[in-house]
């Protein structure tokens, strides 16, 4: 899930935001956070358990209000299905029994449920799509039958696996028809979730969120106000502003545009946030996405200059985990006026744009000052620990864990096909 918003940038005039048509307001109004009740959201990817050696048990769960478990895939019929059943439901972790009677679930989803049992303020959502699977949205979203299949099967996975909702990551609707289809897809999902909530013993509301674009060439195509009626909050992907697809090196997650080197900031978080609010999305429903990684530029003379290649990376070329930063021999530059930072090795002529602890603190200030809904991170395996943790820095900047949203999760799933989950994962 690397959100290449810059890859689609053209020299054409950006499409203006679509007009908002009226829709019935018969759906529950999403819960606004209490004063100071910030959301702390992180993506956990199911492939992290392999080379990265990162498992759900490694999460510092008390720092988060929501974990988005990524990713489920979509069939042309609209059926939502798990993308890696061994990681998702089959892998046995220490303490999992091989001779447990009945039909039982294991893997990462069991571990997510156990995290919820130990931290009743932690919610988990099944995230569907992502960059790789996003082309699979178009066909099922275009028909009522496909949308119903999507809503019904994502709801079933939520009930079977013990999630508190679903997160949709469609990158990105390409035209007005697909934008309309997205609204209708969210409507179908909201109706399915609310129908289940109405008959659920506890009657709790189940959540619906999306990963939303920060590039105007993408969000100007969306019907933001109409979508907002069905969403609990928006995870704004305010990163990947610059990368290998550009002609000059740039900041990949700056809050404000640079006035001294505008070519280094083709996008900014602040513009996206203001445009969303102008379109009708409440600030307290916008969760600011932040990267736990950096993007690299090789053979460059500095920020905003030409480059040639991206060099190596932690797991893919040109992308470095935050915990691998800064590299030996590189000098770190922090630009507080635009809330951006980077490292540069003048001998190797190698630049990496990433967030430092100081810049994470500036982003926490921005979230607070603008009354936003909290912070989100991609992805959980890449952070440092202790005082160097970007997540911890932002959470502390928002006032600490006591200022996070207080909303109890759901542990009762009487319709689950898995006996151990249906019984609350007895020890």
UniProtKB/Swiss-Prot annotation:
<dbReference type="InterPro" id="IPR011583">
    <property type="entry name" value="Chitinase_II/V-like_cat"/>
</dbReference>
<feature type="binding site">
    <location>
        <begin position="129"/>
        <end position="132"/>
    </location>
    <ligand>
        <name>chitin</name>
    </ligand>
</feature>
<comment type="similarity">
    <text>Belongs to the glycosyl hydrolase 18 family. Chitinase class V subfamily.</text>
</comment>
<dbReference type="InterPro" id="IPR050314">
    <property type="entry name" value="Glycosyl_Hydrlase_18"/>
</dbReference>
<protein>
    <recommendedName>
        <fullName>Endochitinase 1</fullName>
        <ecNumber>3.2.1.14</ecNumber>
    </recommendedName>
</protein>
<feature type="active site" description="Proton donor">
    <location>
        <position position="171"/>
    </location>
</feature>
<keyword id="KW-0146">Chitin degradation</keyword>
<feature type="binding site">
    <location>
        <begin position="237"/>
        <end position="240"/>
    </location>
    <ligand>
        <name>chitin</name>
    </ligand>
</feature>
<keyword id="KW-0732">Signal</keyword>
<feature type="domain" description="GH18">
    <location>
        <begin position="38"/>
        <end position="401"/>
    </location>
</feature>
<dbReference type="Pfam" id="PF00704">
    <property type="entry name" value="Glyco_hydro_18"/>
</dbReference>
<keyword id="KW-0378">Hydrolase</keyword>
<keyword id="KW-0624">Polysaccharide degradation</keyword>
<dbReference type="InterPro" id="IPR017853">
    <property type="entry name" value="Glycoside_hydrolase_SF"/>
</dbReference>
<dbReference type="InterPro" id="IPR001579">
    <property type="entry name" value="Glyco_hydro_18_chit_AS"/>
</dbReference>
<feature type="binding site">
    <location>
        <position position="172"/>
    </location>
    <ligand>
        <name>chitin</name>
    </ligand>
</feature>
<keyword id="KW-0119">Carbohydrate metabolism</keyword>
<feature type="binding site">
    <location>
        <begin position="102"/>
        <end position="103"/>
    </location>
    <ligand>
        <name>chitin</name>
    </ligand>
</feature>
<dbReference type="InterPro" id="IPR001223">
    <property type="entry name" value="Glyco_hydro18_cat"/>
</dbReference>
<dbReference type="GO" id="GO:0006032">
    <property type="term" value="P:chitin catabolic process"/>
</dbReference>
<keyword id="KW-0325">Glycoprotein</keyword>
<feature type="glycosylation site" description="N-linked (GlcNAc...) asparagine">
    <location>
        <position position="387"/>
    </location>
</feature>
<dbReference type="GO" id="GO:0008843">
    <property type="term" value="F:endochitinase activity"/>
</dbReference>
<feature type="site" description="Transition state stabilizer">
    <location>
        <position position="169"/>
    </location>
</feature>
<feature type="binding site">
    <location>
        <position position="378"/>
    </location>
    <ligand>
        <name>chitin</name>
    </ligand>
</feature>
<dbReference type="GO" id="GO:0000272">
    <property type="term" value="P:polysaccharide catabolic process"/>
</dbReference>
<feature type="signal peptide">
    <location>
        <begin position="1"/>
        <end position="17"/>
    </location>
</feature>
<dbReference type="GO" id="GO:0008061">
    <property type="term" value="F:chitin binding"/>
</dbReference>
<dbReference type="InterPro" id="IPR029070">
    <property type="entry name" value="Chitinase_insertion_sf"/>
</dbReference>
<keyword id="KW-0147">Chitin-binding</keyword>
<keyword id="KW-0326">Glycosidase</keyword>
<dbReference type="GO" id="GO:0005576">
    <property type="term" value="C:extracellular region"/>
</dbReference>
